[in-house]
Amino acid sequence: MVHNKNNTILKMIKGEETSHTPVWFMRQAGRSQPEYRKLKEKYSLFDITHQPELCAYVTHLPVDNYHTDAAILYKDIMTPLKPIGVDVEIKSGIGPVIHNPIKTIQDVEKLSQIDPERDVPYVLDTIKLLTEEKLNVPLIGFTGAPFTLASYMIEGGPSKNYNFTKAMMYRDEATWFALMNHLVDVSVKYVTAQVEAGAELIQIFDSWVGALNVEDYRRYIKPHMIRLISEVKEKHDVPVILFGVGASHLINEWNDLPIDVLGLDWRTSINQAQQLGVTKTLQGNLDPSILLAPWNVIEERLKPILDQGMENGKHIFNLGHGVFPEVQPETLRKVSEFVHTYTQR
């Protein structure tokens, strides 16, 4: 076990005094790291995630290289879907492709339930390896939100308009709600197993939920999100972060959920979120594209985010989306260092 652990992010969420604003980056594990790219010449994403030693190495890299205040487990939101009967393939340049999309309630009924110890032991073994031996910062486990997972399962892959997904919601509520309930059950078991293995925070990625309006979110999504988070928290008092893209119109709905941290994309400032009545710890939210700019521009954009975060009092610095592969590792290191220095108290 690691002594003198850096628990800054957990202290921030609890409202305790911290020495600086904690920082981590979505997609910090992999992508822009040369060590990771070298591994990808030999191994696929699923190859790496199925080998705990390799997966732990990739997960740990950004903590060593960028001095982040948290690690996030290297895996894909599709990980729990394969074991329940979803024929998913990760295609380069496309993303997840589902070869047996959900169309009817019979398709939902064919899905099995997940047994994490049996179906994803490599995920749990990676977490145990990290938390028992090496990691000196909290580990973030994660899952895709039911809507985002369902959208892939129904559309058959990434989508711009989510027409098939919305059509199912509007035309066939029985199938939609059956799928939502099944995915909540899967997610609760999957997340709970991660926490029991040693994850100290959970992030729920609802990447595509911004495609819905408020009325549809309330009717078709919100009750299932409440059940997912509540059932996890009934088992373990673990902080939960929720993040989505292009979903500022849903901020008040998210603030109602039993989450601890609300992740902002780059379109909504911390001050705007406060003005909308958000009471949660806020996470974010530098536009990841800014990391491709010269350092003076990056620093200029960092300061107002950090100033607003310090004024708010409960802020975790992150990007407003994931790290782009083109971002230089040195840039991420400098951002992390700047956040720590600028917010030092």
From Swiss-Prot:
Signal peptide: none annotated. The record marks D76 as: Transition state stabilizer. It catalyses: uroporphyrinogen III + 4 H(+) = coproporphyrinogen III + 4 CO2. The keyword Hydrolase does not apply. Its EC number is 4.1.1.37. The keyword Lipid metabolism does not apply. It is an enzyme of class 4 (lyase). GO terms for molecular function: uroporphyrinogen decarboxylase activity. CDD domains: URO-D (cd00717). GO terms for biological process: heme biosynthetic process; protoporphyrinogen IX biosynthetic process. It holds the Pfam family URO-D. Substrate binds at R27, Q28, A29, G30, R31, F46, D76, Y152, S207, H321. Pathway: Porphyrin-containing compound metabolism; protoporphyrin-IX biosynthesis; coproporphyrinogen-III from 5-aminolevulinate: step 4/4. It is found in: Cytoplasm. Catalyzes the decarboxylation of four acetate groups of uroporphyrinogen-III to yield coproporphyrinogen-III. Belongs to the uroporphyrinogen decarboxylase family. Homodimer. This is Uroporphyrinogen decarboxylase. It comes from Staphylococcus aureus (strain NCTC 8325 / PS 47). The lineage of its organism: Bacteria, Bacillati, Bacillota, Bacilli, Bacillales. The gene is hemE.
